[in-house]
Amino acid sequence: MSWFKRKDKKFKDPEKKSIPDGLWDKCPSCDEILYRPELEKNLSVCHHCEHHFRVAPQVYVDLLLDKSSETHLYQNLESKDFLKFKAVKKYTDQIVTAKTKTGEKDAIKVYDGKINGESVVLGIMNFRFIGGSMGSVVGEAVSRAIQKAIKDKVPFLLVCASGGARMQEGAISLMQLAKTSTQLAKFAKNGGLYIPILTDPTTGGVTASYGKLGDVILAEPGALIGFAGPRVIKQTIGQDLPKGFQRSEFLLEKGFIDHIVSRSEMKEKISTLISLLT
């Protein structure tokens, strides 16, 4: 037992190894700890419960459009503080912060490209840019995209992700509901195929306009889709809401959307719809 009396340690304490930030994510649905490189390889879909994480627009570009077929359109559009909106943080400062955070000019990107060889116009919203809110730039970009689809006689696809109209632009943001809906009416009159893809979340003015005006409405699994949020509705009516209320599975059951499509199957589903409906 002489080793109890040893004064000098013969063994060193193991060195603590630092783990780089950003290597792990926790699934908000099943609480599984996920290795980020593997998660991204799986299109940011949890391999345990199929929860679809929110992703950047570039993920949808790579996922949906044929390689090297895309052309980025309307890159010169930028938001302005028409109303000189004053809040805790000025609107102009919010725009600068969002641009720095996302590397984008606003909450939407528009491309023309091909899906399995078929030409399309594709719009993709970015929830990380001021909650994907619809202001003058989003409305103008969507309108121009529809006009291009009419001119080129190609389908128009729009990946929706938004908290609704951009309150910092007041009535100007609300005008975009009518503006985009009018353009979609023209598109339909010209026989165009419009497919919105509703992702988590799609709410507010986007749901009340182009989010629900599709010929075929697709949604990702588990996406929050509605006008007002569930918390607001619960407070207003004073009642508990049904399980899964405003999730894509609930909306499919009630007939508000047409198909729920996993991210990995989205391109082939859209390609099939285009071949059947054009």
Where are these regions (language model features)?
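Cys/His-rich microdomains that often coordinate metals
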Residues: 33-34, 52-53
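Glycine-rich anion/phosphate-binding loops
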Residues: 101-107, 132-147
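Conserved catalytic cores of soluble enzyme domains
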Residues: 163-278
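N-terminal alpha-helical interaction blocks
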Residues: 1-15
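A structural preference for short, pocket-lining loop segments at secondary-structure junctions
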Residues: 113-125, 141-165
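Short cysteine-rich clusters marking metal-coordination/redox-active sites
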Residues: 27-30, 46-49
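An N-cap/entry alpha-helix motif that binds or orients negatively charged groups
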Residues: 13, 25-26, 53-110
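Residues immediately within or flanking Cys/His clusters that coordinate Zn2+
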Residues: 24, 43
